Design a protein with these regions (language model features):
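Metal-dependent nuclease catalytic cores that hydrolyze phosphodiester bonds in DNA/RNA
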Residues: 2-4, 16, 23-126, 151
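Mg2+/Mn2+-dependent nuclease catalytic core
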Residues: 102-196
Length: 233
């Protein structure tokens, strides 16, 4: 089982089902309950980026058409240029490169999920999280977004909606050809309940791997403690 802790500055808010009170980060960087107990005493601290998370769970084959050409320094520079050009064209209300993170608590671990949304903007009263992908593919032929790209945007959308108490949230997938600069967009909107269930299912899957990691670590540490060393120090 796991639960989500909202991260806001140096203070973490626990969702209603938790009964341990708010979590506070002290000057030493330790997480404490308001009662003064060390909350993370026996939890393994794990970290993963949003991109690595969704690629670990969903990736199937080549998602970015990363030929040697696409991985060249010139291609990476072109990708950065396209990102900035698209972000700059979206107007003053467009927030670019928004850092987002939260802590997901499992029985044996606390997992920090973090990354940067390419952009967040509001249109006609609706909020969208933008995920920009530059590539050499003919984007006009895309009939739907690449699944793992969509999952990345949905993770950011969930975190943003959670931390801002939003009832609905949208995602926009922006695909741009690096040579022609032709652009194609895909949009979806979700209720908070829909995107929360999606994220919960995602974390349930990753939680199996995280729990396995923690169990292996705990077994290894227990074995080390049982070793008899020939000399006392």
């Amino acid at each position: 089982m796991f639960s989500v802790l909202k991260m806001s500055g140096v203070r973490l808010k626990i969702l209603p089902e938790h009964k341990t009170g708010n979590i506070i980060r002290n000057m030493q960087g330790e997480y404490m309950t308001e009662a003064g107990n060390n909350y993370s005493e026996k939890k393994t601290q794990l970290h993963i980026s949003v991109r690595n998370l969704v690629e670990f769970i969903f990736r199937e084959g080549d998602i970015d058409n990363r030929s040697s050409r696409a991985m060249s320094a010139d291609a990476m520079m072109e990708g950065t240029r396209i990102h900035r050009k698209i972000q700059g064209s979206m107007g003053k209300e467009y927030q670019a490169e928004v850092p987002l993170s939260l802590v997901v608590e499992g029985d044996l671990y606390e997992l920090t999920v973090e990354g940067r949304a390419d952009g967040i903007f509001t249109e006609d009263g609706k909020c969208f999280v933008d995920e920009i992908k530059g590539m050499y593919r003919r984007v006009e032929l895309f009939e739907k977004p690449v699944f793992v790209h969509r999952a990345q945007a949905m993770c950011y959308a969930y975190i943003f909606a959670l931390q801002n108490n939003m009832e609905t949230i949208g995602i926009q997938m922006t695909y741009c050809n690096l040579e022609t600069e032709q652009t194609k967009y895909f949009r979806e909107e979700f209720s908070f309940e829909e995107i929360k269930k999606w994220f919960d299912d995602l974390m349930e899957e990753y939680g199996k791997w995280a729990t396995f990691q923690c169990e292996m670590k705990n077994q290894r540490q227990a074995s080390i403690k049982e070793l008899d060393f020939p000399y006392e120090y």
